[in-house]
């Protein structure tokens, strides 16, 4: 049995898609376990760029099974569109498996997400407005509609009708907007269900069988630890658990089945949406990193907020996710910056904090304590090993590993898979 979980150690957008794609080459099964189409990842395959939001990045390899796990919330309309997008470009999706227990995002979830964000005004969370939160709310309230329900015409009709009564009351009485009619949703979404029916099964069985047979299984997290609903910067978080522990619930495999956890980080920090960000840059260096690193959201197109690397954040991620291996991305983006900074702790009212605080009020008063390191000017985009890095670049990478307490296993010096280098195998 060899299982690897890939998690983001920051606020998402760390380059997990690329690392998952890279690790997929040696995996036999690739599974997603949480989130929905609020996450976007860009994969370069055979020289072409593909943007995926729902389907695991291993889909490009016909001999590998790709799983959408039970912990995900699935927008059937978006999924059918993504399947068509791949088919039009000649990519087969016969290797896809969708959990019959995954929950379904429906039009009223999208509408409620949008309206609630508007209602909050200055206190908005900064959601992607993809209906993720409202769908997870229905799941917790035990009124959600699952994929297995979507495939059964009678069950879907009954549950949808019941939910619409409640949602329409909410839309009309609280938000003052028109509700939805059953006939405007039912046939369209039932057809989406029929379109994906051939992929639907009990994916927990698929995954556990693969693990029991000793096959290599890769679990692909979306977002990042700092967006985890329990461990992140609550309430500026997603509605699921991107931490490695989310695999056991969202994929239906026991905790004893997880062997390695790869924490993916950028050599700096980014964040999309609202919420605290202690090392955020509001100067020319921040603008430079954003432009060189092309820091714009895959899903939203929004410019990402940019800051220095924060070892307090990544240490927190290591602890709550049990991270065993570090994958450090986008080192090349920092080339040419004279002096680099790494946050080693926070200063709060004269105290030094080495652990990430739960209180946003405390966090708002925290000032980062920086360690300064000399930068480098050499082009590192063709580097294939740590030994080939300029001395200052290597020192920067090794210092991050020391400060976070995570051994370096992978480092990346560009967006292409050929620019991803292995220091030690995560499948060992």
Curated annotation (Swiss-Prot):
Residues reported in the UniProt entry to bind substrate: 298-304
Keyword Transferase carried by entry: no
Cofactor or coenzyme needed: Mg(2+)
Pathway(s) the chain acts in: Purine metabolism; AMP biosynthesis via de novo pathway; AMP from IMP: step 1/2
Example GO biological process: IMP metabolic process
Cofactor: binding comment: Binds 1 Mg(2+) ion per subunit.
Enzyme Commission number, as recorded: 6.3.4.4
Pfam families recorded: Adenylsucc_synt
GO MF annotations in UniProt: adenylosuccinate synthase activity; GTP binding; magnesium ion binding
Assembly, per entry: Homodimer.
Protein name: Adenylosuccinate synthetase
Source organism of the structure: Geobacillus kaustophilus (strain HTA426)
């Amino acid at each position: 049995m060899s299982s690897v979980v890939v998690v983001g150690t920051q606020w998402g957008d760390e380059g997990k898609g690329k690392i998952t794609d890279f690790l997929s080459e040696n995996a036999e099964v690739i599974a997603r376990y949480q989130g929905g189409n609020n996450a976007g990842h860009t994969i370069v395959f055979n020289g072409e760029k593909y943007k995926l939001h729902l389907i695991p990045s291993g889909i490009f390899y016909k001999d590998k099974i790709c799983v959408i796990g039970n912990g995900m919330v699935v927008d059937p309309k978006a999924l059918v569109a993504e399947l068509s997008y791949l088919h039009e470009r000649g990519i087969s999706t016969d290797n896809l498996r969708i959990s019959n227990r995954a929950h379904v995002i429906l039009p009223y979830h999208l509408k409620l997400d949008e309206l609630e964000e508007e209602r909050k005004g200055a206190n908005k969370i900064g959601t992607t407005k993809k209906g993720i939160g409202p769908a997870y709310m229905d799941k917790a309230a035990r009124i959600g509609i699952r994929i297995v329900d979507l495939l059964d015409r009678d069950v879907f009709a009954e549950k949808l009708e019941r939910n619409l009564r409640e949602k329409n009351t909410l839309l009309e009485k609280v938000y003052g907007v028109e509700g939805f009619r059953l006939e405007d949703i039912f046939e369209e979404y039932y057809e989406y269900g029929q379109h994906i029916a051939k992929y639907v099964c009990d994916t927990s069985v698929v995954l556990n069988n693969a693990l029991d047979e000793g096959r290599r299984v890769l679990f692909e997290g979306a977002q990042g630890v700092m967006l985890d609903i329990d461990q992140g910067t609550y309430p500026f978080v997603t509605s699921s658990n991107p931490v490695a522990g989310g695999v056991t619930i969202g994929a239906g495999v026991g905790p004893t089945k997880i062997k390695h956890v790869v924490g993916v980080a950028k050599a700096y920090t980014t964040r999309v949406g609202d919420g605290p960000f202690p090392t955020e840059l509001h100067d020319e260096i921040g603008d430079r990193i954003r432009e060189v690193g092309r820091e714009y959201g895959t899903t939203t197109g929004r410019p990402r907020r940019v800051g220095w690397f924060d070892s307090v954040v990544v240490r927190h991620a290591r602890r709550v996710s049990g991270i065993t291996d570090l994958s450090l991305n986008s080192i090349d983006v920092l080339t040419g910056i004279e002096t680099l900074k790494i946050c080693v702790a926070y200063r709060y009212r004269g105290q030094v904090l080495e652990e990430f605080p739960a209180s946003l009020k405390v966090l708002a008063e925290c000032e980062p304590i920086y360690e300064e390191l000399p930068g480098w000017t050499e082009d590192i985009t063709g580097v294939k090993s740590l030994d080939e890095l300029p001395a200052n670049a290597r020192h920067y990478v090794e210092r991050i590993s020391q400060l976070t307490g995570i051994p370096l296993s992978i480092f990346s010096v560009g967006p292409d898979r050929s620019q991803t280098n292995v220091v030690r195998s995560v499948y060992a």
